[in-house]
Design a protein with these regions (language model features):
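Short beta-strand-centered segment that lines the nucleotide-binding/catalytic pocket of NTP-utilizing
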Residues: 176-196
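Extreme N-terminal, non-catalytic leader segments
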Residues: 109, 115-156, 293, 300-329
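Gly/Ala-rich beta-loop-alpha elbow adjacent to hydrolase catalytic centers
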Residues: 363, 367
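Patatin-like phospholipase
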Residues: 208, 214-215, 220-225, 234-362, ...
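Cyclic nucleotide-binding regulatory domains
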Residues: 15, 35-107
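Cyclic nucleotide-binding regulatory module and flanking cytosolic helices
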Residues: 1-40, 92, 124, 128-129
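Glycine-rich phosphate-binding P-loop
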Residues: 153-181
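A short, Lys/Arg-enriched amphipathic alpha-helix followed by its capping loop at the start of a domain
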Residues: 171-183, 346-356
Length: 611
């Protein structure tokens, strides 16, 4: 066993079983070595549970079957196992059947501790069972947190060009340089093998990797925290090896090229027995000012987890890719709250000034609209000025109509979103999503592709205030009715930390009357000096606040799962108080700046962005 792998497994044994030094070494020496090829199953869900395994080399995936056999639901990926971690603890304790299946992403080596050997050690160390049970509880907590293992401890990444890529060499150099600022990194291409002393003669068209080359690659992986495999342009033995060895695959496409998957790409990545490694698409554009369009043509027909845009030699976007690979990218979630959402504009400026990167944006209602503006990647000044034009000068809340479908026609809102936020979601420089709900059954919709303005029209269609939006011949309404702070959706993305801005209020509404006054009494109180004045919320405020009530508990629950929750003091502002735009933005900025400074002082993993 290589030194680094030995130390990782030894540390895991000590952590799980609470034994040290010679006892831990003795347990390690008593483990049996197991080799498993990429794509093969270590065991399947429902198999007899009779052993615990420690991963020495490679990477594994945890899969669970749908609860109802034969249902339309597909097996679900729970997470990934990385070197030094263990699998099968529950089975060793209970002796039942496997609650999940374990499949190798790439060729992997494990050490096996069977029940008999475990019981032998338990006699010598009575606390072994309790120590293992505690370790299981901790691991279950880690593994059930959404997104927690998305890019955790990647050891190998394959860069696979989808055609001629004259920019590839420069990109590899910049990517490797950025990674080396963080961890020990080695970049390997077919041209590098001979220079580095690899047994290149061992390469063959066969899928299996010859032993001499396998040992050479293992040594490189042991000496470096991360290996970057650069595949050839096309189907070659080296390209096959790169894909087979990868924990994660980055498909590299030139935005101006033919987006249709080639025959060799389909064969290597999507045929039976192909790798199950996570994959993402990186689309290269000539320069930062190049328009992004037709991304959907690259996404169709490809099974990818996410995609990113790389404009020219942008250091900022190269750094975003690095953060995604290292598991410390930042997702920003913006909640709904009508005019109080202007505070999110200020929070964004505070993040930008503090150097906090934004690698993914998601939001609901007003948060979705502001989030889409942020995803254009034009900076805080652009977002502030265009938000002011849209909501203060555009007056979308003053578009009253005959209240048949709603109080507001929604024409102004539609016109504003069409004008300021054109294009498709998948073409945005920063990945984005927003939330809406189906009117007929309340099912949540996550908008990640298609027309930006249509998605925003849906996420902000507050029932009673604005007419429902039409999406695929279904009526949809404001996402605040089902998920007003979609941190859970962001946790499913490849982000390491989540910053959320919650602009809902906990204010108590108290009145000085026992029965609701009539509309005429309210009007009289406003017009006639000697009449009693009644403090009552307007119909729009009632509609907006009512929409929040149903998800208030969920918002509080979601907020606990954010790494940084920013709650600007905006309760003094009304839900339609667009005239206070600048004051609300300032309130969000001041509060966020203070909270961000505290957060960054405590979490050294927050890496300032590269502009």
């Amino acid at each position: 066993m290589q030194n680094r792998a030995h130390d990782q497994v030894l540390e895991t044994i000590e952590r799980y079983f609470g034994i040290r030094d010679d006892d831990a070494e003795a347990m390690l020496d008593g483990l049996d070595s197991v080799d498993i090829a990429g794509g093969d199953w270590l065991f399947k869900q429902g198999a007899a549970a009779d052993a615990l395994y420690f991963l020495v080399r490679g990477r594994l995936q945890v899969w669970v079957e749908p609860e109802v056999r034969g249902s339309e639901s597909a097996p679900r990926l729970l997470g990934e196992i990385t070197p030094g971690e263990s699998v099968g603890e529950i089975g060793l304790l209970t002796g039942g059947v496997r609650t999940a299946g374990i499949r190798a992403i790439r060729d992997s080596q494990l050490l096996r501790l069977d029940r008999q050997a475990f019981e032998h050690f338990a006699v010598r160390h009575p606390n072994l069972v309790m120590q293992l049970a505690g370790g299981v509880a901790r691991r279950l907590t880690e593994r059930t947190r959404p997104g927690s293992s998305a890019s955790r401890n990647l050891s190998t990444v394959a860069l696979v060009p989808l055609g001629e890529s004259p920019w590839l060499a420069d990109f590899c150099d910049r990517l490797t340089d950025e990674l080396r600022k963080r961890v020990s990194t080695l970049c390997l291409s077919s041209a590098d093998l001979g220079k580095d002393g690899a047994p290149v003669d061992a390469l063959s068209p066969e899928d299996s990797i010859p032993g001499s080359l396998h040992r050479w690659l293992d040594a490189r992986e042991n000496d470096h925290r991360l290996l970057i495999y650069v595949a050839d342009e096309g189907d070659t033995p080296w390209s096959r090896l790169c894909i087979r060895q990868a924990d994660m695959i980055l498909l590299l496409g030139d935005a101006g090229a033919d987006p249709t998957p080639s025959q060799w790409e389909t064969q290597l990545l999507d045929s039976d027995g192909a790798t199950t490694a996570r994959r993402a698409l990186i689309l290269h554009h000539p320069d930062r000012d190049s328009p992004i369009a037709d991304t959907i043509q690259w996404l169709e027909g490809r099974d990818i987890e996410f995609h990113l845009h790389l404009r020219g030699d942008s250091d900022a976007e190269t750094s975003r890719i690095v953060r995604m690979l290292m598991g410390d990218s930042v997702g920003l979630v913006l909640g709904g709250g009508a005019a109080r959402g202007f505070a999110e504009v200020g929070a964004y400026r505070a993040m930008h000034e503090a150097g906090v990167p934004i690698d993914w944006v998601g939001g609901t209602s007003i948060g979705g609209i502001i989030g889409a503006a942020i995803a254009l990647d034009q900076g805080p000044d652009y977002v502030t000025e265009n938000s002011r034009k849209a909501f203060v000068e555009g007056k979308p809340f003053g578009d009253y109509t005959l209240p048949v479908l709603s109080l507001i026609r929604g024409r102004r809102m539609e016109k504003l979103t069409r004008h300021h936020l054109q294009g498709n979601i998948e073409d945005l420089p920063i990945p984005f999503f927003c939330i809406s709900a189906l009117l007929d059954n309340g099912e949540m919709r996550v908008h990640e592709r298609g027309s930006i303005w249509r998605a925003l029209r849906a996420t902000a269609a507050l029932p009673g205030m604005l007419p429902p939006a039409v999406m695929e011949q279904r009526l949809v309404v404001d996402g605040s009715t089902v998920n007003n702070l979609p941190i859970d959706i962001m946790r499913e993305k490849p982000v390491g930390r989540v910053v959320a801005v919650d602009v809902t209020t906990r204010r108590t509404y108290s009145v000085d009357y026992d029965d609701m006054p009539s509309p005429w009494s309210v009007i009289a109180g406003k017009l006639i000096p000697w009449k009693q004045r009644y403090r009552v919320p307007g119909v729009i405020s009632v509609l907006m606040k009512s929409a929040e009530i149903g998800t208030a508990a969920r918002v509080r629950e979601m907020g606990r799962d954010a790494d940084l929750l920013i709650r600007p003091p905006v309760s003094e502002f009304g839900l339609t108080d667009v005239k206070s735009f600048d004051r609300i933005v300032e309130a969000g900025y001041d509060h966020a700046r203070e909270q961000i400074a505290k957060w960054m002082s405590k979490d050294e993993r927050v890496m300032p962005r590269s502009d």
